[in-house]
């Protein structure tokens, strides 16, 4: 039995295999976890090595490819260039946003399962979050300076393209762990996100999105239950605005469907398969 000793030998062995596909998650795997997602880093050597695997490598992540918080920005930082990845195919191919943002090595993107109305609405959500949160904080914490309020809102609104999120950790800390106030702030957070959900329904997107609370107390009538603050813990700190059907398990089926079609010319789950019509 031959033992592969070098990275080059391993890459060559993978390339020589006719039917092999490596599917890898990103955050916590090849991107170390950090408190501030904007400070994440990816290793240059990793980026260059996986590009050599071509169609035998794919990522599958609930992070995102594009946008200021996207992995594509980390790749560009690692290469110290905003053009090298595009020119040489160094972007990480595969599915992001839990299965609805697909790209190749050159960052050519598609959004299987999403329609233009959903994409357009998602693009407006962070601004709507900011406006509603600013209004609520003016009432709830009237003594805040404009500068402090703006900073708290900036940190709270996570403007990811397909999973816009409210994170109230910083605001909870600002009220100095007054758990009655924290609970009131949780109600504000829930109110804002429910308003967004109702706004989406009012323009015909009633089956497009749901709210994901972190942490939560399970489901009631199909919706996640808020974990309210106690003297011992904050409870729910984040609420994400999530696309229905966007889960990694379904995304894996989509990746396999594409891979098999490229090898055989046949889509086992159908040419129009996406996470929205995957088995539940």
List the predicted regions and their residue ranges:
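A short acidic (Asp/Glu
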Residues: 34, 68-74, 105-106, 168, ...
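Short loop/turn segments at strand-loop or loop-helix junctions that form parts
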Residues: 22-29, 94-107, 159-171, 231-234
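Conserved acidic, metal-coordinating active-site core of Asp-based
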Residues: 145-280
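A conditional alpha-helix N-cap/helix-loop micro-motif detector
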Residues: 3-4, 39-43, 245
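Well-ordered alpha-helical segments embedded in enzymatic catalytic cores
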Residues: 6-9, 42-45, 251
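Active-site phosphate-binding/coordination module
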Residues: 40-161
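Asp-based phosphoryl-transfer active-site loop
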Residues: 13-39, 59-60, 94, 252
């Amino acid at each position: 039995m031959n033992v592969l000793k070098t990275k080059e030998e391993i890459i060559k062995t993978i390339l020589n295999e006719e039917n092999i596909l490596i599917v890898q998650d990103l955050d916590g795997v090849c991107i170390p976890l950090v408190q501030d997602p904007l400070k994440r880093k990816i290793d240059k050597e990793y980026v260059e090595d996986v590009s050599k695997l071509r169609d035998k490598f794919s990522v599958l992540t609930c992070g995102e490819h594009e946008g200021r918080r996207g992995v594509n920005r980390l790749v560009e930082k690692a290469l110290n260039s905003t053009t090298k990845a595009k020119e040489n195919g160094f972007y990480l191919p595969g599915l992001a946003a839990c299965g609805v943002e697909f790209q190749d090595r050159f960052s050519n993107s598609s959004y299987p399962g999403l329609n233009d109305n959903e994409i357009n609405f998602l693009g407006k959500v962070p601004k709507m979050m900011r406006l509603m949160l600013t209004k609520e904080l003016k009432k709830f914490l009237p003594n805040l300076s404009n500068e402090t309020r703006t900073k708290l809102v900036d940190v709270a609104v996570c403007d990811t393209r397909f999973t816009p999120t409210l994170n109230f950790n910083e605001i909870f800390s600002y009220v100095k762990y007054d758990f009655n106030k924290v609970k009131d702030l949780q109600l504000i957070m829930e109110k804002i996100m429910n308003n967004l959900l109702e706004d989406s329904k009012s323009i015909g997107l009633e089956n497009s999105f749901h709210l994901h609370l972190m942490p939560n107390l399970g489901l009631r009538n199909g919706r996640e239950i808020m974990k309210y603050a106690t003297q011992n813990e904050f409870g729910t700190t984040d609420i994400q605005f999530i696309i229905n059907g966007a889960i990694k398990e379904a995304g894996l089926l989509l990746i396999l469907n594409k891979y098999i079609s490229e090898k055989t010319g046949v889509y086992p789950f159908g040419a129009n398969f996406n996470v929205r019509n995957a088995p539940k």
